[in-house]
Amino acid sequence: MHKPVLLNEVINFLDPQPGEFIIDGTFGSGGHAQEILKKLGPDGKLLGVDWDEQSFSVHAISDSRFSYEVANYSDLSEILKNPLAGRQVKTFKADGLLLDLGFSSEQLGSGRGFSFQKDEPLLMAYNSVTKPAKDVLKDLSEEELAGVIKNFGEERFFGRIARAIKDQEKIKPIETTGELVQAISRAVPMGYERGRIHPATRTFQALRIYVNNELGNLEKVLKHLEEILNPGGRVVIISFHSLEDRIVKNYFRDFKKVGKLKILTKKPITASLEEIAINPRSRSAKLRAAEIL
């Protein structure tokens, strides 16, 4: 089973109390949600939200205090205006919000093209309505693709990789992860990053972020925190790369300046060596938390 990252730290900063209404905006496999429910008492409510249509069919929690929405967490302010949201929840704002921005080991193994470790259809989409990565490669110009790889992957060979991909597309459209890896590998120099990471790592990250509008989703939910959380409500966000962490840090800082929130984490919280040994995925996790004023 997918191990929830920074579980103790999430509970510490989210601080769910009996009777509260908490939102897990990235339900995933439900690891954080199960622990949150333990703290809510008989009258608390937990709303799970996930864009991945498979999450709730596989990991739905059988508990009258739990309800779920198959939706994008960026739409939470709209979801909460719907009287059905949260089922028995009588308020349209929550006392806590958790966002774990990583993708799970189950998604990596889902056959949807998130991983470059095996050859599978190049989809990279969390649901069936999002345009798949293979179509994105066809639609973007070389210049546009280079911008995606540079800005979302922070890849220094962005131009060479974009050119190699578009050159390959002229011969035969790239349909699988294996074909994309081959194009990338041809573009980067031998000894790429001195072997520290796979040559495809940053390009795959960039395409996944672009296909699913991950940074735009994060910015949208941050803009609407006051519509989502009650005064005193807590938001806990776990990010896994510098682009996400920078957005969270800057929004928290800007909201603090105008007296909208109190930052609870002066520096991002990271995993202990013990947790990293058990769950290597936690190595790059950074947790930031704040309280709405």
Residue ranges of predicted features:
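S-adenosyl-L-methionine-dependent methyltransferase catalytic core, i.e., the SAM/SAH-binding region
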Residues: 1-293
